Amino acid sequence: MGLLDAGFSRDNVLVAPVDAVLNWARLSSLWPMGFGLACCAIEMMATNASNYDLERFGIFPRSSPRQSDLMIVAGTVSMKMAERVVRLYEQMPEPRYVLSMGSCSNCGGPYWEHGYHVLKGVDRVIPVDVYVPGCPPRPEALIGGLMKVQELIRMEQIGMSRQEALKKLAETGVEPRPFIERERSSAGA
């Protein structure tokens, strides 16, 4: 007996808010565009490899900003490169998200004090949704950051601004740390 033979009874109907259905579809198909600039890019590439299998989370790396909804800025952003970061960000369709990966893209890293050529954080030129600390952060930390972006998408509602969604996410206290710890413990076993 197939679905059509059984008919459409109340048991076959799923009732959910439109927000929940749209957010589920968006968070289950994140298409990040990697913007690797320094050593953090190596860790980002390792995360995209088969050992970590991002596709199990519905995350498929894209090379074009017009096909992406998430930009991962990984590494040192120089003043000259900042213009390109902004240009690529503007080419991405809405809704778009930014994940800053590593100390250099978060706050300038070791170049903070004496590096006149380094941007002191990518958030000075584009809005950043999730920061992943580390120098360079491990692939597990990047996966945790991607999970944080998915939680941010899950919390959004139609008509809600990004700042309201970030505030709502912070109030729930959702943290990706348990996932990171579980991955490390299973990798060592």
UniProtKB/Swiss-Prot annotation:
Domain of life: Bacteria
Entry's EC annotation: 7.1.1.-
Nucleotide-binding as UniProt keyword: no
Key words of the record: 4Fe-4S, Cell inner membrane, Cell membrane, Iron, Iron-sulfur, Membrane, Metal-binding, NAD, Quinone, Translocase, Transport
Pfam families documented for this protein: Oxidored_q6 (PF01058)
Cofactor(s) needed: [4Fe-4S] cluster
Enzyme category, top tier: translocase
Compartments it resides in: Cell inner membrane
Biological processes, Gene Ontology terms: aerobic respiration; electron transport coupled proton transport
Topology of the protein relative to the lipid bilayer: Peripheral membrane protein
Catalysed reactions, semicolon-separated: a quinone + NADH + 5 H(+)(in) = a quinol + NAD(+) + 4 H(+)(out)
Positions contributing to [4Fe-4S] cluster binding: 39-40, 104, 135
InterPro entries: NADH_UbQ_OxRdtase-like_20kDa (IPR006137), NADH_UQ_OxRdtase_20Kd_su (IPR006138)
GO CC terms, sorted: plasma membrane; respiratory chain complex I
Subunit structure: NDH-1 is composed of 14 different subunits. Subunits NuoB, C, D, E, F, and G constitute the peripheral sector of the complex.
Function: NDH-1 shuttles electrons from NADH, via FMN and iron-sulfur (Fe-S) centers, to quinones in the respiratory chain. The immediate electron acceptor for the enzyme in this species is believed to be a menaquinone. Couples the redox reaction to proton translocation (for every two electrons transferred, four hydrogen ions are translocated across the cytoplasmic membrane), and thus conserves the redox energy in a proton gradient.
Protein name according to UniProt: NADH-quinone oxidoreductase subunit B
Organism, as annotated: Chlorobium luteolum (strain DSM 273 / BCRC 81028 / 2530)
